[in-house]
């Protein structure tokens, strides 16, 4: 049985012996071929078996399931099988919201009430290398007016929801899970600990580390050995779909369910606008009783973003899932839509754009994971050497995506979507300056530059809707990207969590010029008859109520260009292409409780 191992078989624990037998039965004898006798490299061999046990324990169904899934998917890939064969696409049902109207406000209010029964899950396994940034992505500043990093912004948003949803109810603590990877785990923990968890109780936060999966060297799904080390299987990330199996195996979902929670919200690591959209989307989930609610944005036909689509199979099965943009057009053409993916009379595709933020109802989610063990339908993307598809240029692996969770759901599941305007909900930071500068004009840059400018734009438009006179933006080319530069307006989530909250804090005749900066750092800051031409920062503790009025006029903060190649500047500034020269500002700080008036 263990012939290729020879006497090395005796080095193994009973658990390892079982695993090795299973591997040998599944065509993996090459792993142990030509091993030296016991006494040579024993420590390396033991480390190898420990690695195999880890790979086995961290995959639903173990390594044998991984190998069998790989054989099936690799055979489909070689044969050119289309996963959508037999499926007909149609437009799913969902809710389209318009910021600030009565319907939107109603959903926002419902979502805030519901937040006390929610848990949040951040998928944060990535580093910022693709952005030209050497750290973890969640440590990047979302904007540089205040320097607030993404993780701080997310935590402060959850805390603001926690507080708002507790009004009139008992105090609650909203749980927050962060999925990390080997690359990000230690640094994420350091970021939290060195900043006192940004105001959260450490017990509210759980880090779940994702393991990698084995690489595959050929169509027979033989596990690939590390070219530099015969006692190590080569591994690569499995994708963010692992979040489901991690939540399942950790037991945390049952804890939440027993504590009376009802919703799990999943989000990704660098979208500075996301929490503006969450209250209303959660309100849609609770009002419509969706088991799965995908947040979406209007999508232009053929735009490079997946479309949310209902797929109905000839055998009667149906599902509502994300279909990647390069698959959606051919699928539509093959299904009686001769023009494929085209814009409707609204000017947008009827298939909304998936932004990878999901709201799941906890009860049905637990039931589904009990059936699947948290496994998500996978795919494989081998790079073949030639058209024969018999060998790979380099090893491949199976991958899975968080948003493919609905693929296994029964037809009775209520799967919907909520469409929000892009300016309000979606500004991811994922492209470096060079790549963003190559994006065709009119398409989104999705860079640190555009991500920061999108925050100022959204805040400006929200204040405008609340009655502020906000000057029009100017167009400027920064890091090779033409962006709208609005007044640099920022506020803490607890100040303006919802539109109705913003409206309650702004009154009279208020205005701000395009070159201005306004940073609101406090909960009870009320703005009345204020005009800003320059820079104004108001910082107040929670129990300080501050009324701000009058006319602020100073030289302000100048926006100065930074060349992304200029190594004398910090990376966080180089990747966005600008910095603020803080020439002059009015800064008011209130560190004691009480009522205060600031008249400029």
UniProtKB/Swiss-Prot annotation:
Optimum temperature is 45 degrees Celsius. It is an enzyme of class 2 (transferase). Pfam families: UDPGP (PF01704). It catalyses: a monosaccharide 1-phosphate + UTP + H(+) = a UDP-monosaccharide + diphosphate. GO terms for molecular function: UDP-N-acetylglucosamine diphosphorylase activity; UTP-monosaccharide-1-phosphate uridylyltransferase activity. It comes from the Eukaryota. GO terms for biological process: UDP-N-acetylglucosamine biosynthetic process. Keywords: Nucleotidyltransferase, Transferase. Its cofactor is Mg(2+); Mn(2+). The N-terminus is blocked. Belongs to the USP family. This is UDP-sugar pyrophospharylase. The gene is USP.
């Amino acid at each position: 049985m263990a012939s290729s191992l020879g006497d090395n078989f005796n080095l193994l624990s009973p658990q390892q012996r079982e695993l090795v037998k299973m591997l040998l039965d599944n065509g993996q004898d090459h792993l142990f071929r030509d091993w030296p006798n016991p006494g040579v490299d024993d420590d390396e061999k033991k480390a190898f078996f420990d690695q195999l046990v880890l790979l086995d324990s961290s995959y639903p169904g173990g390594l044998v399931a991984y190998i069998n899934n790989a054989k099936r998917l690799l055979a489909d890939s070689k044969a050119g099988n289309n996963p959508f064969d037999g499926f007909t696409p149609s437009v799913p049902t969902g809710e389209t919201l318009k910021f600030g109207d009565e319907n939107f406000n109603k959903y926002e209010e419902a979502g805030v009430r519901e937040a006390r029964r929610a848990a949040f899950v951040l998928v944060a396994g990535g580093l910022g290398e693709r952005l030209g940034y050497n750290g973890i992505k969640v440590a990047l500043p979302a904007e540089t007016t205040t320097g607030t990093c993404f993780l701080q912004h997310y935590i402060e948003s959850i805390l603001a929801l926690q507080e708002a949803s507790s009004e009139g109810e008992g105090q609650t603590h909203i749980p927050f899970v962060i999925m990390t990877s080997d690359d990000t785990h230690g640094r994420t923990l350091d970021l939290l600990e060195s900043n006192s968890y940004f105001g959260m109780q450490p017990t509210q936060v759980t880090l779940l580390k994702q393991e990698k999966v084995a690489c595959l060297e050929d169509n027979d799904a033989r596990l690939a050995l590390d070219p530099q080390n015969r006692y190590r299987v080569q591994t690569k990330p499995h994708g963010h779909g692992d979040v489901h199996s991690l939540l399942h195996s950790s037991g945390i979902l049952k804890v939440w369910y027993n504590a009376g929670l009802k919703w799990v919200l999943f989000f990704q690591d660098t979208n500075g606008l996301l929490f503006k959209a969450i209250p209303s989307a959660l309100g849609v989930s609770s009002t419509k009783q969706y088991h799965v609610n995908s947040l979406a944005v209007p999508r232009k036909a053929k735009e490079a973003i997946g479309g949310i689509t209902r797929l109905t199979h000839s055998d009667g099965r149906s599902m509502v899932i994300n279909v990647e943009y390069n698959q959606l057009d051919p699928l539509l053409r093959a299904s009686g839509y001769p023009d494929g993916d085209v814009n409707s009379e609204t000017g947008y595709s009827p298939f909304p754009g998936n932004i990878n933020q999901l709201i799941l109802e906890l009860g049905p989610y637990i039931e589904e994971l009990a059936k699947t063990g948290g496994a998500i339908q996978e795919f494989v993307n081998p790079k073949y050497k030639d058209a024969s598809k018999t060998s790979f240029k380099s090893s491949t692996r199976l991958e899975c995506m968080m948003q493919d969770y609905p693929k296994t759901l029964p037809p009775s599941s209520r799967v919907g979507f909520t469409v929000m305007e892009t300016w309000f909900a979606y500004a991811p930071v994922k492209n470096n300056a060079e790549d963003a500068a190559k994006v065709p004009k009119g398409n989104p840059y999705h860079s640190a530059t555009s991500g920061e400018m999108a925050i100022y734009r959204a805040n400006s438009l929200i204040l405008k809707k609340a009655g502020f006179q906000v000057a029009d933006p100017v167009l400027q080319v920064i890091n090779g990207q033409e962006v709208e530069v609005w007044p640099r307006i920022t506020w803490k989530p607890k100040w303006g969590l919802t539109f109705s909250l913003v409206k309650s804090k702004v009154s009279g005749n208020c205005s701000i010029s395009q070159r201005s900066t306004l940073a609101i750092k406090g909960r009870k800051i009320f703005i009345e008859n204020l005009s800003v031409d320059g820079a104004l920062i108001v910082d107040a503790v929670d129990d300080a109520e501050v009324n701000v009025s009058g006319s602020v006029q100073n030289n302000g903060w100048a926006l100065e260009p930074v060349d992304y190649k200029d190594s004398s500047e910090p990376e966080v500034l180089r990747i966005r292409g600008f910095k603020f020269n803080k020439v002059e500002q009015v800064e008011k700080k209130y560190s004691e409780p009480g009522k205060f008036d600031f008249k400029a």
